[in-house]
Amino acid sequence: MADEDDYQDMDNDDFVDDNEMEDVIEEDPQRPDNEDEDDDNVDENFELFDQGKAVPTSEHVTTPFMTKYERARVLGTRALQIAMGAPVMVELEGETDPLEIARKELKQRRIPIIVRRYLPDGSYEDWPTDQLQLADW
């Protein structure tokens, strides 16, 4: 450990006296004096993008198979919900792991989650998990 004696030789040249510091506030010449920073007119600072349109269920373009990426996201999301205290949609037989419970719910098609698939034209399709087929079970 270092003793206080080791630091006795240090000069305080690197430290500036607080009394020498001056606070300078620069005013923006372009801004009128009566404008506050908390104005409600902040809409002009950003651009809104068009929302995509939903494709009707009867006109789905994509396949009804759940991809491994969708499966991973659905299971992870549902496991997090279960871990945070969401009600379980299946009968528990001693399972305590939220991920195992989510897998059991997915096998029985009881997960209350909708998968949204975005299409290249900006539109999207909503698929309930009970309508998607699981290929690798």
UniProtKB/Swiss-Prot annotation:
Domain of life: Eukaryota
Keywords: DNA-directed RNA polymerase, Nucleus, Transcription
Location of the region described as Disordered in the Swiss-Prot/TrEMBL record: 1-43
CC per GO annotation: RNA polymerase I complex; RNA polymerase II, core complex; RNA polymerase III complex
Keyword Transcription: yes
MF annotations from Gene Ontology: DNA binding; DNA-directed RNA polymerase activity
Main location per the UniProt record: nucleus
SUPFAM superfamilies referenced in this protein's UniProt entry, alphabetically: RPB6/omega subunit-like
Skewed-composition ranges (Acidic residues): 1-27, 34-43
Pfam families for the chain: RNA_pol_Rpb6 (PF01192)
InterPro entries found in the cross-reference section: DNA-dir_RNA_polK_14-18kDa_CS, EF_Hand_1_Ca_BS, Pol_omega/Rpo6/RPB6, RPB6, RPB6/omega-like_sf, Rpo6/Rpb6
GO biological process entries: regulation of cell cycle switching, mitotic to meiotic cell cycle; transcription by RNA polymerase I; transcription by RNA polymerase II; tRNA transcription by RNA polymerase III
Gene3D superfamilies reported for this sequence: 3.90.940.10
Protein localization: Nucleus
Function noted in UniProt: DNA-dependent RNA polymerases catalyze the transcription of DNA into RNA using the four ribonucleoside triphosphates as substrates. Common component of RNA polymerases I, II and III which synthesize ribosomal RNA precursors, mRNA precursors and many functional non-coding RNAs, and small RNAs, such as 5S rRNA and tRNAs, respectively. Pol II is the central component of the basal RNA polymerase II transcription machinery. Pols are composed of mobile elements that move relative to each other.
Complex and partners: Component of the RNA polymerase I (Pol I), RNA polymerase II (Pol II) and RNA polymerase III (Pol III) complexes consisting of at least 13, 12 and 17 subunits, respectively.
Family from the record: Belongs to the archaeal Rpo6/eukaryotic RPB6 RNA polymerase subunit family.
Protein name: Probable DNA-directed RNA polymerases I, II, and III subunit RPABC2
Source organism: Caenorhabditis elegans
Gene: rpb-6
